[in-house]
Curated annotation (Swiss-Prot):
Protein name: Uncharacterized oxidoreductase DltE
Localization per Swiss-Prot or TrEMBL: Cytoplasm
Organism of this sequence: Bacillus subtilis (strain 168)
Single GO term (MF): oxidoreductase activity
Gene: dltE
List of residues binding substrate: S139
SUPFAM superfamilies: NAD(P)-binding Rossmann-fold domains
Listed EC numbers: 1.-.-.-
Chain residues that bind NADP(+): 9-33
Phenotype upon gene inactivation: Cells lacking this gene have no defect in lipoteichoic acid or wall teichoic acid synthesis.
Length: 252
């Protein structure tokens, strides 16, 4: 993926990794559009980054995804990079049945269905561009799950698998498929549960990870993690079992 002169759409771009990525891509000479559910957060992002374009959209809603696609192609016909960043993370205890499954959002719809659907919508357009990319934001937990976040981890594992197959299908086109698999990053993602689990401020900053991601792009990497995640991704079966037990021994 080239580093400049792109037109980039970032879902969930009003905070955290999405906003930091938008900031850095603007600095590199790209045109950047962010979308998010909150008009207030989008306005704050616009105030912070006056050159950014914003669009209110809840990508957990299928009809809004389709409307976003139509709007984006009409307003930005040269759009050549899609970043599927929007996501939520929930602590769910299945001993409680369905009590927590759909409260505060549907992880499967937002974390997996939305990026799959958006990828399908935009791919025909992206294939017409001389250079294009789809960036999927997964997680280090795609490689070894934290049991307190069971559905989140499963959606990220599914999105990792989807990224592999989509990359294979598009291998002879102009569209690169790039996976961002960050470690724990100190954003507002699921702050209440992180506080409860003692995970607050134990991650790296958005600035640090986005710099790592951009460095990976320069090197031509298609799957960009960091040293923390590489240990999970590259684990042997024995290591995997040990890491799973280690990661989940302090589960509440």
């Amino acid at each position: 993926m080239k580093m400049t002169n792109n037109t980039v759409l970032i879902t969930g771009g009003s905070a955290g990794i999405g906003l930091e990525l938008a900031k850095r891509l603007l600095e590199l000479g790209n045109e950047v559009i962010i979308c998010g559910r909150s008009e207030a957060r989008l306005a704050e992002a616009k105030q912070q980054l006056p050159n950014i374009h914003t669009k209110q959209c809840d990508v957990a809603d299928r009809s809004q995804r389709e409307a976003l696609y139509e709007w984006a192609l009409k307003e930005y016909p040269n759009l050549n990079v899609l970043v599927n960043n929007a996501g939520i993370q929930k602590e769910i205890d299945f001993k409680k049945g369905t009590e927590e499954l759909f409260v505060d959002g549907d992880e499967i719809e937002l974390n997996f269905q939305a990026p799959v659907h958006l990828s399908a919508l935009f791919t025909p357009h992206l294939m017409k561009q001389p250079e294009a990319a789809i960036v999927q934001v997964t997680s280090g937990l795609a490689f070894n799950p934290l049991a307190v976040y069971p559905v989140y981890c499963a959606t990220k594992a599914a999105l990792h698998s989807f990224s592999l197959t989509l990359r294979h299908q598009l291998r002879d086109t102009s569209v690169e498929v790039i996976e961002m698999a960050p470690p724990m990053v100190d954003t507002g993602l699921n702050q209440k549960s992180r506080d409860k689990q003692g995970l607050t401020y134990r991650g790296i900053s958005s600035e640090e990870y986005v710099q790592y991601f951009l460095d990976g792009l320069k090197e031509g990497k298609q799957e960009i993690t960091n040293e923390r995640v590489e240990g999970l991704r590259d684990a042997t079966r024995a290591d995997y079992d040990r890491l799973f037990e280690q990661m989940n021994t302090q589960e509440n």
